[in-house]
Amino acid sequence: MKLKNCFFFTIWMLIACCLNVACSGGGDDPFVEPEPPVVALSLSAPVVSDITTESAVVTTKITGNSSDLKKGFCYSSINKNPMTSDIVLECSSTGNELQVSLSNLEAGTVYYVRAYASTSFSTTYSSVTSFVTTSNTANNELDSYQAPSYPDDYTSIADWSKRSQWNLSNVHDPTVVLADDGYYYMYQTDASYGNAHEKGGHFHGRRSKDLVNWEYLGGTMKNLPDWVIPKLNEIRKAMGLKEVNPDKKTFGYWAPCVRKVKTGLYRMYYSIVCPGTIDGDGTWSERAFIGLMENTDPANNDGWVDKGYVITNASDKGLNYRVKADDWSRCYFRWNAIDPSYIITPEGNHWLIYGSWHSGFPAVELDAETGKPKATLPNPWGTVNEIAPYGKLVATRQMGNRWQGSEGPEVVYNPNTGYYYLFVAYDALDVPYNTRVVRSKNVDGPYVGIDGTDVTTKGGDMYPILTHPYKFSNGHGWVGISHCCVFDDGKGNWYYASQARFPVNVGGNAYSNAIMMGHVRSIRWTEDGWPLVMPERYGAVPQIPITEEELVGNWEHIDLGYSYGNQKKSNVMALSADHKITSGTWKGSSWSFDADKQILTANGVQLYVQREVDWEATPRRHTILYVGLNNTKTYWGKKVP
């Protein structure tokens, strides 16, 4: 046994020695060129072009050693990370660029595609690109689309006699409700170019089926409610002041809020501003009231029945009203009873949030049956604790500041996010007006901004900014874009409506800033639950899915960073087919597109894209817009030729 083992060991050693000699070059062997280094194989993200209803061209580039590989593209309409087990189209190209034409695709469908290169041992994949094939009806719908044609400069039809042509002319502080009859009803502050509205009552209404074409209905209130002057004098008497009898034409009729309570019941809260001062020169301005009307059917514009007084201004300074009406820092009233916003919570609780300038916005719980405050209201003056029934603070720009530029609160609840959203108008209404939003899990706060600022318990500036004075390259742009209402269509689509004004001295018109148009805009919600308002007005453009190919080209980009009273202007940003940003603010950065979510990511910022009207084009036409958010900074964009 030992001899046999030794024999095999000897044979093995001889073979090893022979192999060693054969494989070594020795001193006389010629120099052998070393093998080139192996470059790791990589595939660029596919670029999709020439998209039709049933085909698309896909291109990728290969870097590294790619000989003797199987290579091509795999794609799927189901698997978001397609593999070679899905549909495969092999490519026989020997260069570093692969290109194939995908065919037999389904119209109007999202596809996911990536390149691959494989050996018998492994497969290398590119990143995924998604695209949407053209809908069979998409081209026809978009080609036949007619943009709204009504003029923005409506001065030629501003007269009361031409009110049937107004559409969204002469709108200020709008409030909108979707009624049982399928119409959207809009009501507003008494304001118009040249005060044309004065011939037709108060809290004017109009309605629309499509949010684009609006029918003027007229005033919902014919005269000053009978309760207003008696209530004013009741309070004045309790304050030790003499009775007054102001001219009814001098009262202000401001900022209503309309809501559907249930089938067959609609409520409109409204503001009445009393003229004059409390007790002559050297005293603060007179108070305001919030009242209530109800209607069973808003199609009956004369069917609004007044339900009387709801709440009034309250002061935490007792009867120390001898403050000059322009001594803002010593403002007599803590709460200002205008700009109501009414909300019914998912649990069935009714709340009113109101206020303008002064110390911020208070919230009051209401009785569901009457629509009036649950708590008994004491005299509207006293200490902070004594006037507590007039509301608890839910938001303020600066704690302790008695005169701050914030008004027009609008509170809504989004069941998809579980948050209450408080929209606020900032600054003066003529030019600087801009819209902010904060949110809370509770209707009465604390409300917090996107930057973490608690504006309920600590106070502070509210972010993000949703609208701001702006100007695209063509046209005059818009200013004074705020005091909004926010509503949905019951189908998951949300809208923002407010007035917007012409800038000062447009076309040589010294009164151009009094031209006020109603603007309805679409809202998109970010993935983390913040609302974004589109940079152009809603025009019922067919929402055909946007393809990646359509994004390539020039965009007008606006940074909506806060600048008091200044129109933010656009600059051109170009997106190239190879996913580079070649000009503009983010030049040198890259971009990508998620066709499924309709989100363009540029310079790391998610931009939500949507088809809307290019209102500055002549003639108006459909285009693509984007809106995005990066912490406190908002971005608007519009695709241009």
Predicted regions and their residues:
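Bacterial N-terminal signal peptides that target proteins for export
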Residues: 1-11
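Residue-level signal for mature regions of secreted extracellular proteins and peptides
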Residues: 11, 16-17, 53
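Hydrophobic/anchoring residues in structured secondary elements
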Residues: 12, 48, 107, 216-222
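Carbohydrate-active catalytic/glycan-binding domains of CAZyme proteins
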Residues: 28-29, 135-641
